[in-house]
């Protein structure tokens, strides 16, 4: 067949300098490019749906394979056998979960209609070594009242507006337009884990991590959730919370117009 192959991938980002190939460190894309070359016999580009930062994880990352410098790939390997074949050439912290043929003009990043991220806060009194590099450890207990404030604050993120206040200062972004449409934002607690989930048509640089840091500030009483809508409109990054560590961030789901 001919076209592109869309991969569904999961990875632990701890050992990598983000997704996209760069000269100063090993990235997830570099490992996938190597695996694709080993499988398909020539240089390939494995273009991702997002440029995740160093240390960020993914449960449902999407990337499309084509021969380097082209928009096509040709192979007789059945799509249901590609995941296992790719995984034979990948390290244990990266796994191809599924593969599907898509049209040659499909773009895994620009065809996205929504993404969902999850941020994990471990709220145990003592650190858990099994959560090392998998969650942000905040040992100060979050009361039920503080959790309710976090939930009220998360609701303030929902809507279509300029989110400059939640973008990294000085970020070299592709789009000067900071308007994004957040369709869902929730906070839940399960045992010692506080889970923040957010879905939008796109995200600014460090936006989810700044949201998580802002929610932590709300829990600590440093930001009143009633003030948050005005702070977002004000657009001043300095009035929001810290940028939460990358280790707690997971790309949870990527949505396309088609069921891919």
Please name every model-derived segment.
Residues 1-260:
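Structured-RNA-binding interfaces characteristic of tRNA pseudouridine synthases
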